[in-house]
Amino acid sequence: VAPSCGGATQRIVVQMPPTIRLSLPGSPATIGLHSDQVYPNHTAAEVNWWLPLTPVYESNSLWLESRPGAEDYRPVTLSPGEALRFNGHECRHFTVANETDTSRVSLDWRAVPEELACGTLTRIGEFGEVALVEASPVVDDHNVQGV
């Protein structure tokens, strides 16, 4: 996570705990079209991470645009063990009704270098807020897709 935050940062602020999301076959969309900048306590420097624990494709996946304002929405296709990092602060994303026979179980969180964290990230270490962690070098990121 740390290298995706840019530069030689030594510490990163990470959303804790990650959000777990479930979508059963036949369930409606879980979140509408949005970018994270509309929510309080989100900074432009944050990097979104999405980790599906089940195969995701077509309507049981997250849909997003390739760059801010592109409006070229497409579903993300990933297998368990793969992750997606993306600019959710500026790129719009959403889900649709799950018309597949596969449930979606996923985790998502945001991370930002400590030096770029906005002043509203003050409750470090509290449940449901953020954690300050030491950065470590990447050993292998071949299972990470970036948008």
Mark where each language-model region is.
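Catalytic core of non-heme Fe(II) oxygenases with the double-stranded beta-helix
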Residues: 29-85, 104, 118
